[in-house]
Amino acid sequence: MDKLKIVLGIETSCDETAVAIVNSNKEVLSHKILSQQEHAAYGGVVPEIASRAHINYLYELVGSCIEESQLCFNDIDAIAVTAGPGLIGGLIVGIMMAKAISSVTGKPIIEINHLEAHALIIRMFYEIDFPFLLLIMSGGHCQFLVAYDVRCYYKLGSSLDDSLGEVFDKVARMLNLGYPGGPIIEEKSLLGDSGSFTLPRALTNRPGCDFSFSGLKTAVRNIIAGQKCINHELVCNISASFQDCVGDILVNRINNAIVMSKDIDHRINKLVVTGGVAANKLLRNRMSVCANDNGFEILYPPSKLCTDNGVMIGWAGIENLAKGYVSNLNFFPRARWPLENLRFDILRK
């Protein structure tokens, strides 16, 4: 029997400061996360504020996690840390903390691709083998990939402009709903009429599974600009129309992505949807019906682990460690780090 592995995961790629300790038995031994409320006043993440908050709180969260788990650093088998993609300032804070712990304890360090952590967290909760179809929807990314193995992905399509999470945040800002926008728009949409406004469903008449959301964002802005009064009813109707439009786009693109994935590998029969937008219950319902109609099983992480967290970084560390993938101390933060490039990074090392 393989020895139980324990990994400390550190996540500081955006505005969540998160630390977790997980083991290879798929147990969360401790998990601490601090979301920064200061960004709400700006309608989005301010990199300088985010990085300073990571500096202020990360050391305390690491110590709190160690204490809660009733372990010591000698019990940890490796330290996993987000190295990208993300905001450089925040990434530097997390990486320097992880490198310091690794240097002092002599424990291996593993640089984690943030997107891969979103992709692999599903395997902590479901027995799902490779390959599978993957849809990542977050504040910075919206893309379909085929996941063949740890650090081995093939991109099928992605957003040509804005990410879906970014559009949710910007629409919420236009409506003065605050940040983050996704949960608020979902809540308001339940009270509105989705047929109130006709919005563009870009690329849905074209093959492939790329996305384009910039036209949708502009259309919402134009609707708002044409109103004399923005009352609660209007906010709810715009939210409902916007979310219904997003649902139609996702269904169309999923239909195409399923066909494309089956053409690539006939074994693929599961769709994993992850990232912050995957927590949206209304969109989950639309996507689930679509996948089931295509004979695919669709899987989502627990809603609280769709957004950025330390558990997914720790689990990605477990998966990488099992493959023998560890890093030296010379790696650097990356603002951009395409998931499909991971296999080439292995070859270079």
UniProtKB/Swiss-Prot annotation:
InterPro entries: ATPase_NBD, Gcp-like_dom, KAE1/TsaD, TsaD. Its main location: cytoplasm. It comes from Ehrlichia chaffeensis (strain ATCC CRL-10679 / Arkansas). Fe cation binds at H114, H118, D308. The lineage of its organism: Bacteria, Pseudomonadati, Pseudomonadota, Alphaproteobacteria, Rickettsiales. It is found in: Cytoplasm. Substrate binds at I136, M137, S138, G139, G140, D169, G182, N280. Required for the formation of a threonylcarbamoyl group on adenosine at position 37 (t(6)A37) in tRNAs that read codons beginning with adenine. Is involved in the transfer of the threonylcarbamoyl moiety of threonylcarbamoyl-AMP (TC-AMP) to the N6 group of A37, together with TsaE and TsaB. TsaD likely plays a direct catalytic role in this reaction. This is tRNA N6-adenosine threonylcarbamoyltransferase.
